[in-house]
Amino acid sequence: MKKVLLALGLGVSTLMSVNSFAADLQEGKQYVQVSQQASQQKEVIEFFSFYCPHCYAFEMEYKIPQQVVDALPKDVKFKQYHVNFLGHQSENLTRAWALAMALGAESKVKSPLFEAAQKDALKSMDDIRAIFLSNGITAEQFDGGINSFAVNGLVNKQVNAAEQFKVRGVPDFYVNGKFRVNPEGLNYDDFVKDYVQTVKGLLQK
């Protein structure tokens, strides 16, 4: 019984802590409101580019996306959408990322795609294909899926979402389709923790 009460106490304490943080968030500082209406589904969307050095740091060094995922309630979806406006293979990478999402293979190809893009080693879709094949995706899966109806739909979803939110720079996080995290307003000395807490707080607003 003591353990149950302790667990309940911790749960209430955590909820109060998150709600308190949400109340302390200031529009124009930690976040910007981009819509009057929240999305029907609770979600966090990160827009990124494999060519973006800051996205690389977010993903590979500070692991902010994974820390956000680990902190999210179970009923909140986390999505990563690739943008088309950085790098000469950006459109091919958006399509390849759509294929990775369709196959549930994001974790297999994300790191090698980041590494290759940062080294400017991607000259064509063939180079992207080679990375997929070297990381557990079969030729049949890649060739049969890259221009499939499902992948075309996921490409359009990424492009349309970036246009809807008027994304001009990355990495860029949006919470419930209503709020954009403003990294310039976060605590520089404790940036990663503040970023994650801001996302959690915005989910409560």
Curated annotation (Swiss-Prot):
Highest taxon, organism lineage: Bacteria
Compartments, record wording: Periplasm
The name this protein goes by in its record: Thiol:disulfide interchange protein DsbA
Signal sequence, start to end: 1-22
UniProt record similarity statement: Belongs to the thioredoxin family. DsbA subfamily.
Name of the gene this protein is made from: dsbA
GO BP field: cellular response to antibiotic
Protein purpose: Involved in disulfide-bond formation. Required for HI transformation. Acts by transferring its disulfide bond to other proteins.
Domain Thioredoxin intervals: 23-201
